[in-house]
Amino acid sequence: MSAATDQILEQLKSLTLLEASELVKQIEEAFGVSAAAPVGGGMMMMAPGGAAPAAAEPEEEKTEFDVVLEDVPADKKIAILKVVRAITGLGLKEAKDLVESAPKPIKEATNKDDAESIKKQLEEAGAKASVK
């Protein structure tokens, strides 16, 4: 790849989930395209190919984990919202949107200790969370 594409790739890797979402919206508007997944046969063709490599390398240990907010009880929403804001550094509106749209990833590509710590904080606030 060229230096320009390498630089863009590195910048994309550093984006937060919220920033990536905003970038997708801007690209859709600027180029008149849609990032929606195709419905129908396209997904069926990709599934078998994606499953084969995972089965071929079962002994590779995972080093990056994603913490996913699975469920938010209505009576615990405020406490969970506070924890999500502390973990992600998001503003009130962004954190609220994230909490209300569960299941959603809260933290991606983090180490195992941090992922478990974040999961514990979310569960102590009353949420259901998982580490993937």
UniProtKB/Swiss-Prot annotation:
Lineage: Bacteria, Bacillati, Cyanobacteriota, Cyanophyceae, Oscillatoriophycideae
SUPFAM superfamilies linked: ClpS-like, Ribosomal protein L7/12, oligomerisation (N-terminal) domain
Keywords, ordered alphabetically: Ribonucleoprotein, Ribosomal protein
Transmembrane segments: none
GO cellular component terms given for this protein: cytosolic large ribosomal subunit
Entry function: Forms part of the ribosomal stalk which helps the ribosome interact with GTP-bound translation factors. Is thus essential for accurate translation.
Entry-linked HAMAP family: Ribosomal_bL12
Sequence similarity: Belongs to the bacterial ribosomal protein bL12 family.
Spans annotated as Disordered: 102-132
Protein name, entry field: Large ribosomal subunit protein bL12
Biased composition (Basic and acidic residues): 102-126
One BP term from GO: translation
Domain of life: Bacteria
One Pfam family recorded for the sequence: Ribosomal_L12_N
Summary of subunit composition and partner proteins: Homodimer. Part of the ribosomal stalk of the 50S ribosomal subunit. Forms a multimeric L10(L12)X complex, where L10 forms an elongated spine to which 2 to 4 L12 dimers bind in a sequential fashion. Binds GTP-bound translation factors.
GO MF annotation terms: mRNA binding; structural constituent of ribosome
